[in-house]
């Protein structure tokens, strides 16, 4: 994926637009080459990494538990501006693409093949031979079904309206503008954020994006605290105390409990804690 540290340096509107333009133009050049190109995906391929893979003619996924693909930019309060909003709907259809982009979902290799994101899903032992065969075959990519083409073309408004309604149930635009920007840029500008500089400026330097990027780095720092200097292995947590029983806190508590940890949950009242316990059950 892209270097998230770079986002912290976007202190002017011009820098934000330059960052989007650089990736957009580069990946468009890759997508336009006449010779076959292939992305062999093994491990995490997220954000800018998947946008690079989408610019290739073929995408071959390695069937391992660690192979994950997604466009999770919305989790940082931003959008996939390097071609992901254009090419993902063309690959998998707009409904599936919106589901991935608006929720920041990641998928494994098998699901990537089923939904049409990956041309094939192969075990590690044959990945290099499979990549060679796919490139040399020069076969056309599997086309989108006719109805999906309509939804990605003349009927875009239908998908966009439905997506806005779903997003509105989870977040208000003034507090969380990124998913609304993704819908608008795809529906009105064919995924090209450069045509809507006011959206780029408003999203990239928004307080929401700054705070979510800060949260990301804090999470990464917390992960490092769980590492042990002991040569016997990493520190193994046994008990977790979660402060705040909102949607995120409640889901973290449930996730930890499902993995066998002893979990306690804290908030200002039982009325705030009860919904989290109900969801966990």
Predicted regions and their residues:
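Glycine- (often His-adjacent) and acidic-residue-rich active-site loop
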Residues: 1-26, 45, 75-77
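Glycine-rich beta-to-alpha transition loops that act as phosphate-gripper elements at the mouths
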Residues: 20, 39-46, 100-106
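Glycine-rich beta-to-alpha active-site loop
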Residues: 24, 30-76, 80, 244-247, ...
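Amphipathic alpha-helical segments at domain termini/boundaries
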Residues: 51-54, 60, 100-198, 214-231
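Hydrophobic, secondary-structure "cap" segments at the distal end of domains
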Residues: 84-95
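Phosphate-binding active sites in nucleotide-utilizing proteins
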Residues: 231-281
């Amino acid at each position: 994926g892209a270097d998230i540290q770079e986002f912290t340096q976007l202190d002017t509107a011009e820098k934000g637009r330059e960052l989007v333009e650089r990736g957009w133009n580069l990946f468009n050049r890759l997508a336009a080459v006449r010779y076959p190109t292939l992305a062999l995906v093994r491990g995490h391929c997220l954000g800018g990494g998947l946008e690079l893979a989408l610019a290739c003619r073929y995408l071959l996924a390695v069937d391992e538990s660690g192979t994950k693909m997604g466009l999770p930019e919305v989790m940082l309060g931003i959008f996939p501006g390097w071609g992901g909003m254009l090419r993902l709907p063309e690959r998998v259809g707009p409904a599936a693409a919106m589901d991935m982009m608006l929720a920041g979902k990641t998928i494994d290799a098998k699901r990537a093949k089923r939904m049409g994101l990956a041309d094939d899903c192969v075990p590690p032992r044959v990945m290099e031979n499979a990549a060679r065969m796919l490139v040399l075959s020069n076969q056309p990519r599997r086309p989108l079904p006719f109805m999906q083409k309509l939804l990605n073309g003349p009927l875009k408004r239908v998908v966009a309206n439905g997506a806005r309604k779903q997003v509105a149930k989870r977040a208000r635009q003034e507090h969380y503008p990124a998913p609304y920007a993704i819908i608008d840029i795809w529906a009105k500008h064919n995924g090209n954020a450069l045509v809507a500089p006011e959206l780029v400026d408003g999203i990239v330097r928004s307080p929401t994006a700054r705070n979510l990027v800060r949260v990301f780095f804090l999470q990464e720092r917390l992960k490092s605290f769980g590492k042990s200097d002991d040569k016997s292995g990493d520190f193994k947590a046994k008990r977790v105390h979660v402060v705040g029983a909102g949607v995120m806190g409640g889901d973290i508590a449930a996730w930890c409990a499902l993995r066998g940890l002893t979990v306690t949950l804290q908030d200002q009242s039982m009325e705030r804690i009860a919904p989290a316990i109900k969801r966990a059950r």
